[in-house]
Amino acid sequence: MRCLTKTRSFHYVIIFYSFFFLPFLSSSSDDQRTTVSGLFCGGRSKSSADPNYIPTFVEDMHSLSLKLTTRRFATESLNSTTSIYALIQCHDDLSPSDCQLCYAIARTRIPRCLPSSSARIFLDGCFLRYETYEFYDESVSDASDSFSCSNDTVLDPRFGFQVSETAARVAVRKGGFGVAGENGVHALAQCWESLGKEDCRVCLEKAVKEVKRCVSRREGRAMNTGCYLRYSDHKFYNGDGHHKFHVLFNKGVIVAIVLTTSAFVMLILLATYVIMTKVSKTKQEKRNLGLVSRKFNNSKTKFKYETLEKATDYFSHKKMLGQGGNGTVFLGILPNGKNVAVKRLVFNTRDWVEEFFNEVNLISGIQHKNLVKLLGCSIEGPESLLVYEYVPNKSLDQFLFDESQSKVLNWSQRLNIILGTAEGLAYLHGGSPVRIIHRDIKTSNVLLDDQLNPKIADFGLARCFGLDKTHLSTGIAGTLGYMAPEYVVRGQLTEKADVYSFGVLVLEIACGTRINAFVPETGHLLQRVWNLYTLNRLVEALDPCLKDEFLQVQGSEAEACKVLRVGLLCTQASPSLRPSMEEVIRMLTERDYPIPSPTSPPFLRVSSLTTDLEGSSTISHSTNSTTTFNTMVKTDQASYTSSESSTTRTI
């Protein structure tokens, strides 16, 4: 929103400038050689968003003006924090004063393209271009070259073509400029002085082909990257093509007035843009800080920025624990010797305020052994910081999917992580003072302490859920592969969305495979586990690293298969069929608690369920809820083909 406000403000200045100043300039530019034949604006780059971009542009334009006092061609490049390269070329038949006048008009029109990162303007007497890269030796461009034809027609179908060819040949032979006239038709060809003879020839050959399209028209113009070609039924160039050195007094006065007005307008433009930018930035910062102050005012959990800065060795790279979409986490050692995790937020927008409030307001008042504890925050420094308890073993995904550590977690430890995560979610859904939906349960958001006990982290996407509501309607946010289908399709959010994510997590832990890892023979993890379940070979889905342990510990393999069934129950297509987290805990801990037969998960068509992993049999399995859901969800296996989890936020 802030960037949009800046852009709109800048455009208002341009509009004001165009309506109130350009009429005066137009009155001094009746000479047809200052007629604008083409203005082309490029896209925007990161450089054009730099606050130094406009001042650099103004300085470039001023430097070009000074160079044109002695010649008709000039380039300028300012290599500062934002680099801008500019080129001006007057046609060789123009006198110095005519050249200055043409440039003055071009200089007042080209700001219409700002803050675009590139622009070209063709006048009938000169050419002006700026870019964020050095382009001086460019001759042609399929994307940018253009031509224009007049509306008036003549009888001769080859009118202007032959004389244009002649002018182009003369220009190549005589160093880049040539004119020609025959049978009442006149033409002018001009290459930029930065081009060599061969590049000039290539550019003008293309220009001749372009004006050839203006068959039976009184005038035609080709406006290419490195040259300009024009023909007309009247003589528009000066004399025989050689420039004039005498300067008429009234034209000199006009040039002085136009240049002075141009410089004055550019200064007003720059000053207005800078002021509006600063005012907008200040208002947004005050608004954000005001919201934070009103929402978070507990002095016991406030940290001084300087304290956290020193605790992390000034955010040293050696202290970095991890990096996510909304910030970087560092290890900090407080003055009392306590280790903490300091999250350095990178946002300063409305989304940042919302996620900051979620982190602070939702979990600062709740405590559970399986939830990462928020110790406090700092909002008074140049950036906002959150302080958490330090969890030494980092995240679960590093243990499961790092080949060097995959054997560290045995089945007993994995079961403990599954159960602890379930208890943490059950507390959020019904045991805490408010009902909370996490929305982003995944292996990278489950941290492990020194005893490998799980702690759910990252509450930036969490939502508070009223006791009187059956669901929330909200924008989609979460990680692809973990999001529940009804949430993806309809935006309806309930606790069952977390249950679905937990089910995916269970399958990943038990199988040691990422949800988005695709195997051509068996499909994705969810599909593979389901197919093996229908074949009564669920044990084959378990992590091969656990094979030796299952052989040594009697009953552990059956227990693991039971856990996989619970995972399938949690990932059923219909949210009403999924168990609550309290029921999940009872299924995992009580020997005699009934475990229903799961129905097929979403994103799997019934035809895909007939696949035999060995190709020796055909399975037919009916479902009671999937058929209806599959008519609504048209997503196939491509839903899970990304190589790594990607977070979607469309709030």
UniProtKB/Swiss-Prot annotation:
ATP binds at residues 321-329, 343. It is found in: Membrane. The chain crosses the membrane at residues 252-272. Residues 1-28 form the signal peptide. Residues 315-604 form the Protein kinase domain. Its EC number is 2.7.11.-. It comes from the Eukaryota. Residues 273-651 are cytoplasmic. The keyword Kinase applies. GO terms for cellular component: membrane. Residues 29-251 are extracellular. The modification Phosphoserine is found at residues 444, 473. The active site is at residue 440. GO terms for molecular function: ATP binding; protein serine kinase activity; protein serine/threonine kinase activity. It holds the Pfam family Pkinase. InterPro entries: CR_Ser/Thr_kinase, GNK2, GNK2_sf, Kinase-like_dom_sf, Prot_kinase_dom, Protein_kinase_ATP_BS, Ser/Thr_kinase_AS. Keywords: ATP-binding, Glycoprotein, Kinase, Membrane, Nucleotide-binding, Phosphoprotein, Receptor, Repeat, Serine/threonine-protein kinase, Signal, Transferase, Transmembrane, Transmembrane helix. It is a single-pass membrane protein. Belongs to the protein kinase superfamily. Ser/Thr protein kinase family. CRK subfamily. This is Cysteine-rich receptor-like protein kinase 42. It comes from Arabidopsis thaliana (Mouse-ear cress).
